[in-house]
From Swiss-Prot:
GO terms for biological process: DNA recombination; establishment of integrated proviral latency; symbiont entry into host cell; viral genome integration into host DNA. PROSITE patterns: CB, TYR_RECOMBINASE. Keywords: DNA integration, DNA recombination, DNA-binding, Transposable element, Viral genome integration, Virus entry into host cell. Residues 186-392 form the Tyr recombinase domain. GO terms for molecular function: DNA binding; integrase activity. The active site is at R225, K264, H343, R346, H369, Y379 (o-(3'-phospho-dna)-tyrosine intermediate). Residues 79-163 form the Core-binding (CB) domain. It comes from the Bacteria. InterPro entries: CB (IPR044068), DNA-bd_dom_sf (IPR016177), DNA_brk_join_enz (IPR011010), Integrase-like_cat_sf (IPR013762), Integrase_catalytic (IPR002104), Integrase_recombinase_N (IPR010998), Integrase_Tn916-type_DNA-bd_N (IPR004191), Tyrosine_recombinase_XerCD (IPR050090). This is Transposase from transposon Tn1545.
Amino acid sequence: MSEKRRDNKGRILKTGESQRKDGRYLYKYIDSFGEPQFVYSWKLVATDRVPAGKRDCISLREKIAELQKDIHDGIDVVGKKMTLCQLYAKQNAQRPKVRKNTETGRKYLMDILKKDKLGVRSIDSIKPSDAKEWAIRMSENGYAYQTINNYKRSLKASFYIAIQDDCVRKNPFDFQLKAVLDDDTVPKTVLTEEQEEKLLAFAKADKTYSKNYDEILILLKTGLRISEFGGLTLPDLDFENRLVNIDHQLLRDTEIGYYIETPKTKSGERQVPMVEEAYQAFKRVLANRKNDKRVEIDGYSDFLFLNRKNYPKVASDYNGMMKGLVKKYNKYNEDKLPHITPHSLRHTFCTNYANAGMNPKALQYIMGHANIAMTLNYYAHATFDSAMAEMKRLNKEKQQERLVA
């Protein structure tokens, strides 16, 4: 009968266990790929003390028990050791054909993970507390609440892949961010009717911004996304039927420059009606066009709104213009205008029609929303005045019904 192996304390070692000359314990096993793997610890059992100068650690027998539980539960003991960066890369590789801005967003998050200590951690070692600490670090580094929430959602999706692949049991990013950080997201600006009138009147009369009056008016009266607006070309306008055809958007990237994208969803492809004010504004835009050299971008030309270099304007151009316009207005007027962006004008358009009682499905179509919930959120932007007006309208209709009856 062969003699049992013992450690330097005379304790019998089990199958696969051994002790190195430096006193460290080792456990050898064969993984699912038939490759030998090793687990180490300075302690055989939990009650052991680590040698002087060595960091405390989990005992070998505890590690073996955890390993055997993983194997019993079907956990991939090799896969669970991949880093968070590797897991995120794996998720992205499963969906390689994405839009340019999605690709850019992925790159930003990967760069963040590579610089953060969480990125090199094995996924099996990441706990909910680690994920929450990551969110706090992101906030301390100046990232906005919504940006952190978007990145957290991506990492949560990555861990669902790891769970499906039996690499881990739980998702450390499955928590509410608002329980960790205060939501400092600034509410989207909705212009009141009075603010809308003052903005348009000031732009129309101002020597610098009068050239932008029709652009602002069209945005307020069509609710277009700024990328859709910037991508408008002459063939997109149907004056006979008073429609604006939307089937593409114009974007600009710091690396590749201008490019055309199709709408993110099929709902983005639509025909937006021209109300009279928008119709007349488009007519003025065409009448004021100069016969300059026209650029072509991905097969599209005859863009309606050009900058001084005859390139089509994009979101950054309009953000800068609106910022300057509001700043100038507020300099000369006591009744200040709020911070306004091109999206504020789209938000105002949708809210106005929601408060006017437009059928939600009709408004969803005009806005190009993929989900009706997005549209219904605008119906929640009612003010006390609009709520009171709506109650009066409904009461008046009821009274008229009674009189008819």
